[in-house]
């Protein structure tokens, strides 16, 4: 069986939480919020399996078509990201020791429009600076060169090099929101940092995973 809930930020009971207020609110063409899901396999009363997600993030809006994108000029947008984090730090053997929490980051983007295509960059800063893995990997800020596909885009393997033998990177996927022109952009950001080595060596198999959303508005506000 499966059950869940899907709620916007403005209609939730979390509107006074400082972390969430870093995101744009009351936007003209988009919204974001939370989702929770519980699923269970009750095939056997003695061998049931259940899983749940609490306060995942979602973002959506009024998408525009490729023909609505400008054919010249540029645009700058800014906003924030919200992420669910899970990480394992300085552990060894069977001592899993995973910590979970939520964090935010600043996000900015520049888009350069063309007659038949466009290009862009998304930059993330002030990302989870107090996390020991993110700090050690030198990944508190990173950026993406976007790979556009019509009115949507994707960016993988951020342009930044990791420190101290950390591996991994980040990816972004998004689309434009607006009426007849791109006024906002929103989508997902994923971060995956890890090390690999002997299971008996402390820290050799540590990892950091963050998954969440971003929402940006064109200069001048939403």
Q: Where are the regions that the model predicts?
A:
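Mature soluble binding/inhibitory domains
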Residues: 1-222
């Amino acid at each position: 069986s499966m059950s869940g809930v899907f709620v916007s930020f403005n209609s939730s009971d979390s509107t006074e939480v400082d972390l969430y207020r870093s995101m744009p609110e009351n936007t003209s063409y988009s919204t974001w919020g939370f989702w929770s899901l519980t699923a269970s396999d009750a095939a056997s009363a003695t061998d049931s399996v259940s899983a749940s997600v609490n306060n995942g993030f979602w973002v959506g809006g009024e998408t525009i078509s490729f023909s609505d994108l400008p054919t010249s000029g540029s645009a700058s947008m800014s906003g924030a990201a919200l992420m669910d984090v899970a990480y394992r730090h300085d552990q060894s053997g069977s001592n899993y020791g995973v910590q979970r929490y939520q964090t935010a980051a600043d996000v900015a983007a520049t888009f350069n429009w063309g007659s038949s295509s466009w290009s862009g960059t998304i930059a993330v800063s002030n990302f989870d600076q107090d996390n020991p893995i993110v700090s050690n990997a030198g990944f508190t800020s990173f950026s993406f060169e976007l790979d556009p596909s019509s009115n949507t885009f994707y960016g993988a393997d951020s342009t930044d090099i990791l420190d101290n033998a950390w591996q991994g990177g980040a990816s972004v996927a998004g689309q434009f929101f607006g009426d007849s022109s791109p006024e906002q952009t929103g989508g997902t950001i994923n971060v995956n940092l890890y090390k690999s080595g002997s299971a008996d060596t402390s820290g050799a198999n540590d990892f950091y995973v963050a998954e969440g959303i971003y929402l940006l508005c064109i200069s001048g506000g939403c």
